[in-house]
Amino acid sequence: MSTPIVKSMKVVPVAGYDSMLMTLSGAHAPFFTRNIVILEDNAGHQGIGEIHGGDYTCEALRACESLVVGQPVGKYRGILDSIHKHTKRAKEDDGEGIQTLDISKLKFVVKAEWAIECALLDLLGQALGLQMCDLLGDGKQRDKVETLGYLFYVSDKEKAKELNYLDESDSSDTWFRMRRKEMLTPDAIVSQAQCLHEKYGFRNFKLKGGVLAGSEEMKAVCALKQAFPNGRINIDPNGAWSLAEAIDLCKPLENVLTYIEDPCGPEAGYSSREIMAEFKNAVKLPVATNMIATDWRQFYHSAALKSVDIVLADPHFWGFGGSIRIAQLLNDWGLTWGSHSNNHFDITLAAFAQVGAAAPGKPTALDTHWIWQDGQNLLDDAPRIVDGYLEVPEKPGLGVTLNMNKLEEANKLYNKLPSHDRNDAMAMQYLIPNWKFDSKKPCLVR
């Protein structure tokens, strides 16, 4: 049986609105960007994928067009192999990745071709009448995928009025109103979690740390556990703490936290993987990462040092097939798979659903930023998060339909932006003049 031929490939850069979310790298800008890949085959099907935004990634995708168009959808692995063989490493890519959360290097960790892989799997699934998850690993493992409520500290957008952050104070949706307002205290974080529980049914929560002093962030963690005694509560400071501080903060909370994500990073001449291994020896908590094991080579060293228990293998880092390969290996070794997330539209949400449905064993609840973008749909039929679970689209392929009018609107917004690359330092200047990123200092501690 022959499979359809890819007859066209289009790359559409898009933008959406964001809140003033705080992380170690600074404050999210009013807008985020993504790149959308659209493939069409000679059977009349459309396949789509979504990936990291910015000009670098957009150009990398467009450079692949000649390697994709004219190829049979069924040979998608060969297409990807051809892309890999023709891709040259950027001169600016020093291989460090995001081990210190230098956001300028994220574009080198996210591989553009994985959006093409998603679109090809979408087409192949439609050709075969199978869901995308049936084409990955050992096939579909579940009908819905558990997700967590991703909590963020949010700064006051009124301090950066000229940046024109979106205001949703007139929205009829309680969460939409809340997500644009300042939330920097334990009480505010608990209110955020309660609102998300009511809207999406989340039982499990992760707080993005690296913003305030570690002791202050742990007060919020304890308040969350008190509000949700049966919930799984986690925190991710993105390696902001020293080894000693991480041990001091986490050891008393071994019965409060479910896992700790990237508690510490490189110090005193030792790598992140070595320092995290020492942390694991000192504290009885599972350790997760999306910083020190973002590819197979990094994972090899992480596994050899027993630095982590949970790998948040984002398919935008690992690829869709690669994310499931690592999920299988982790499951065989008695370790745990999950997925990291960045700001994204609902195409990525559908992709998370498909990958999560194919992951074997008992994955940890997946990250998703979708709650911060919910309502900015590019699809006619975005998957829903109900009772804390992401529904897996039932139609063949990715299982969703792109709305071309909404895509065009998002592209117009992108074209109005003065810059297309992520820059978390820009908005920080309105909060702390002359602020500069420091991987060892929470962003509001200067």
Where does each model-flagged region fall?
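Short, Gly/Pro- and small/polar-rich lid/capping loops
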Residues: M1-N35
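Flexible C-terminal active-site loop/helix
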Residues: P4-K7, V12-G16, L305, I326-L329, ...
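Metal- or metallocofactor-binding catalytic centers and their adjacent structured scaffolds
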Residues: E40-A127, W435, S439-R446
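Catalytic domains of carbohydrate-active enzymes, especially glycoside hydrolases
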Residues: Q192-F205
